[in-house]
């Protein structure tokens, strides 16, 4: 099992073999950061609909048209790229945005979703980030119902979190994401 392999590598004594094996891991990290619960200091998003009232057929991943979304932020949170992953097919869209504001997210996600056929625009699951404060406008513009995950629960959007980790190979943390054109982002999404 994959977890056994990771545990065996992390249990090795410090040395050249351990370094070489860690480089081969998917994230290339020498240890895992322990997760702990924290206090939610963000304000509530108005009129948000919880993931717990989301129809069960979305969870089954049998019907296309249900998306998971997130925002990848660049250096000093000044630039950002929106990510949308279709839950059934794994189809990925990267959306260039001016910044990480609610207005940019609303405009970017609305434009990206409206490029898709109506049959594959049913719902989107998102975290409780401030950039989704204008979720009602996205729903109005696209017809996509938006559901919000519980705070500090990234596993409720597992496909998107996994994809974001893979995208970071091409768009590393701490870099200016505004230098990438939409065409470059489309190429990254295709890979």
Model-derived features: positions:
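Two-metal-ion RNase H-like nuclease active-site motif
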Residues: 64-74
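Short, well-ordered secondary-structure micro-motifs
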Residues: 79, 134-137, 159
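Charged alpha-helix within mobile-element recombinases
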Residues: 129, 139-146, 150-191
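Active-site beta-loop-alpha junctions of metal-dependent nucleic acid enzymes
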Residues: 73-77, 94-118
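Acidic/histidine-rich, metal-coordinating catalytic segments
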Residues: 119-134, 152
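Basic, flexible linker segments flanking DNA-binding modules
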Residues: 2-59
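Short conserved beta-strand segments at catalytic cores or DNA/RNA-binding microdomains
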Residues: 59, 72, 76-93
